[in-house]
Each structure stands twice: as C-alpha cells, then as structure tokens.
Amino acid sequence: SDQGDVAEPKMHKTAPPFDFEAIPEEYLDDES
C-alpha cells in the first residue's frame, strides 16, 4: 500500500540495493 511505501526510504522504493556481485540469476535471466 502507499502508506507502507511512504514509510520506506524513497531510494529503497525507487531502486533496491543492487549487489552486482550477488545478483539473483532471476534478475540476469530477466535482463537477457
């Protein structure tokens, strides 16, 4: 819900912490 999103940091909502050294295969598969 929007209320929950507002409570969370905007950075976290806009772009979650991306560890390129530990990116899930799902993300890589989606990007391909």
UniProtKB/Swiss-Prot annotation:
Residues 1-32 are annotated as: Disordered. Residues 22-32 have a biased composition (Acidic residues). It is found in: Secreted. The keyword Glycoprotein applies. Keywords: Glycoprotein, Protease inhibitor, Secreted, Serine protease inhibitor. One of its GO terms (cellular component) is extracellular region. Residues 8-14 are annotated as: Contains the active site. The keyword Secreted applies. One of its GO terms (molecular function) is serine-type endopeptidase inhibitor activity. Its main location: secreted. Glycans are attached at residue 14. Variegin-derived synthetic peptides show antithrombotic effects in zebrafish larvae venous thrombosis model. Thrombin inhibitor. Does not inhibit other serine proteases. Interacts with human F2 (thrombin); the interaction results in thrombin inhibition. This is Variegin.
